[in-house]
Design a protein with these regions (language model features):
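NAD(P)+-binding Rossmann beta1-loop-alpha1 motif at the extreme N-terminus of oxidoreductases
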Residues: 1-58
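A structural signal for isolated positions on well-ordered beta-strands in alpha/beta enzyme cores
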Residues: 2-4, 32, 106, 154, ...
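Active-site-proximal catalytic alpha-helix in oxidoreductases
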Residues: 187-212, 219-232, 258-259
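Helix-loop-beta segment of a Rossmann-like dinucleotide-binding subdomain
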Residues: 99-102, 144-154, 205-214, 262-270
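NAD(P)-dependent Rossmann-like dehydrogenase/reductase catalytic/cofactor-binding core
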Residues: 2, 29-30, 174-175, 223-313
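Rossmann-like NAD(P)(H) cofactor-binding subdomain of soluble oxidoreductases
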Residues: 57-143
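Short, well-ordered alpha-helices that flank and scaffold nucleotide-derived cofactor binding pockets
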Residues: 17, 21-25, 93-97, 120, ...
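Rossmann-fold dinucleotide-binding core
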Residues: 74, 110-189, 193
Length: 313
């Protein structure tokens, strides 16, 4: 099998390391990494190092190929897309060059409308809606650090090809030591996760507060809950079968994080000049609300304030 990891930052690097180790040990596949800058250079020089489970286990691998371009690559059996939301459109155009009708595309991004975003520009292959539970980041060029999360990937059917079952992908990832599960309706998992990350990301970034500070603030906690209700209304309009108490249970998850935890979106926003996934986390909600004529006043006001503050820097 030919497996491309398009983006080998925290997420792509974690799964890319595990799959590469399996392929190198068994000879049952080749991995191709698409990376950039000093990270790419470090991988070419000394391989990619994963510090798994907080550094308890270290795994170093050398992919079959690593470059910042797909030019000259063969058709891929699997493409794992692990870029930031703002790079997705450009990545999709490049991925078009290395897939055919039999390729499986697995997007591992935050967001509730990733499938639709990809299908706007990629008509070939099987695109599997997915979400994941993983806390990783690039510690230094060529080094990935896992700080939390089970690493579970939840995947579902391609709505355009509902009869397709990704047996080869599932077996490959499981043999590589990855926790991956197939769901008949993965949208419940995707929107359930989005229900937590989008409101907390927007509010923590806009007001410069940690997850714990937001959860314990009288006004900001109400704002988070209101945004959650707006997202729940959209999910209902999309006929996604979320539990009736999804907003309450999602908010309660904040207590599972250390009080001082910042969201990754918040950390991106705090770095002047760095791009962020504001459209993925806020713009999506506003567009869906407009489509279904639903209120999204809290989401819009929060996002507007955030973007105004960023523009002033």
């Amino acid at each position: 099998m030919n497996i491309c990891f398009f983006g080998v930052g925290g997420v792509g690097g974690y799964y890319g390391t595990l799959v590469t180790r399996y392929c190198n040990d068994t000879g049952k596949g080749k991995t191709y990494f698409i990376a950039r800058g000093r990270h790419k250079d470090a991988i070419l020089e000394k391989g990619l190092l994963l510090k798994k489970d907080g550094g308890k286990e270290e795994i170093r691998v050398n992919p079959f190929f690593c470059s910042d371009t797909v030019d000259g690559l063969p058709v891929m059996d699997v493409v794992v897309v692990a870029v930031k939301g703002y790079d997705l459109k450009g990545a999709t155009h490049e991925i078009n060059k290395i897939v055919d009708g039999n390729s499986v595309i697995l997007p591992l991004l935050n967001g509730a409308d990733i499938y639709e975003r990809i299908r706007q520009h990629l008509k070939k292959g099987y695109v599997l809606p997915a979400c994941l539970y993983l806390g990783t980041h690039i510690e230094s060029p060529g080094v990935i650090f896992q700080k939390g999360g089970s690493g579970q990937i939840c995947i579902g059917k391609d709505p355009s090809f509902p009869e397709f079952y990704p047996e080869r992908l599932l077996q490959l990832f499981k043999k590589a030591g990855i926790l991956i599960d197939f769901f008949e309706d993965v949208n419940i998992e995707i929107w359930g996760k989005y229900m937590f990350i989008a409101p907390f990301a927007l509010v923590t970034a806009t007001y410069g507060k940690s997850i714990g500070e937001v959860a314990h603030d009288e006004n900001l906690s109400v704002l988070v809950k209101n945004i959650m209700q707006e997202i729940a209304s959209i999910a209902k309009a999309l006929k996604i079968g979320l539990p009736s108490d999804i907003a309450e249970t999602s908010f309660a998850k904040a207590s599972q994080f250390p009080f001082e935890t910042k969201t990754s979106f918040q950390r991106d926003v705090e770095v002047k000049g760095r791009q962020s996934e504001w459209d993925l986390l806020g713009g999506t909600v506003i567009r869906y609300a407009e489509r279904f004529n639903l209120p999204a006043n809290n989401t819009k006001a929060t996002l507007d304030r955030l973007l105004q503050d960023v523009d002033k820097r």
